[in-house]
A protein has these predicted regions:
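C-terminal alpha-helical "lid/dimerization" subdomain adjacent to the S-adenosyl-L-methionine
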Residues: 150-198, 203-207, 212-214
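A short glycine-rich, Lys/Arg-flanked "PGG" loop and its adjoining helix->strand segment in the class I
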Residues: 130-141
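Conserved beta-strand signature within the Rossmann-like core of class I S-adenosyl-L-methionine
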Residues: 143-149
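N-terminal, positively charged/glycine-rich alpha-helical extensions of SAM-dependent methyltransferases
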Residues: 1-18
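Conserved alpha-helix/loop element of class I SAM-dependent methyltransferases that forms part
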Residues: 25-44
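A short His-aromatic
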Residues: 123-124
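Class I SAM-dependent methyltransferase SAM/SAH-binding core
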Residues: 48, 55-105
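A conserved beta-strand element that flanks and buttresses the S-adenosyl-L-methionine
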Residues: 117
Length: 224
């Protein structure tokens, strides 16, 4: 199945609210656990979450690694508003900062983060190269990097089956977003080609579930 682009941002408040209320606990906690297992020596410093959504993952990192300060970035004002409320409710204002901004060209100091993570952002981007360029620009040499996203199935029928198997009870708007995201996602082969083009071919890149891939490693010295 060919890749079918979807809108880059969830700007609609109904979409954002449905996403925030959906049950991504297992996937999001699995993402944080994967990072902690891959980089057990990272116990503090600064972490950047690209495409942080309503801040569930930044807050999970704040709980998992008490020494971290976290900057979350999302291009959707509706998402960031929900995330800021979640951060306030969790009393993590001093450790978790959320910014509404888009890549490329984030107004953040180059090489300022010990770690960069991203879950389910890449498939929103028409040109994935800008994502990897921003990662290399913002992460310090040797920074830990974990990226996870959906894997594009080989047919629309398979995409519908994945939606029904994993989101049958979710709101219709979320189910449609899930289907669109599967159709816009990259295959494992395509991601490995992106890593090679970014000179990150030493990274591990493999399937993380029946519908997700994950890529992780440390940025090379002098990567920026």
């Amino acid at each position: 199945m060919r890749r079918v682009l979807e809108p880059e941002l969830m700007t609609d408040e109904e979409q954002a609210q449905a996403y925030a209320q959906a049950d991504f606990a297992d996937v999001n906690q699995g993402f944080v656990d994967r990072f902690c297992a891959a980089f057990p020596d990272l116990t503090g410093g600064s972490l950047l979450d690209l495409g942080c959504g309503p801040a569930d993952i930044p807050l999970r990192f704040a709980r998992a690694i008490p020494g971290l300060t976290i900057t979350g970035v999302d291009g959707s004002e509706a998402m960031v508003a929900l995330g800021r409320q979640a951060v306030k409710d969790a009393e993590q204002d001093g450790r978790v900062l959320l910014l509404c901004a888009r890549i490329p060209g984030l107004n953040l100091r180059p090489q300022s983060f010990n770690a960069v993570v991203s879950n389910s952002l890449l498939h929103h981007l028409p040109k994935p190269a800008v994502f990897w360029q921003e990662v290399l620009r913002l992460g310090r040499p040797g920074a830990a990097l974990l990226v996870m996203d959906l894997h594009r199935p080989d047919s629309e029928e398979r995409a519908h089956a994945i939606v029904e198997a994993n989101a049958a009870d979710e709101a219709p708007v979320l189910k449609q977003d899930f289907f669109n995201s599967l159709c816009a996602a990259f295959t494992l082969y395509e991601v490995r080609e992106q890593l090679r083009a970014a000179r990150l071919q030493a990274f591990r890149c493999e399937m993380a579930s029946d519908r997700h891939w994950a890529a992780w490693g440390r940025l090379p010295k002098g990567a920026a």
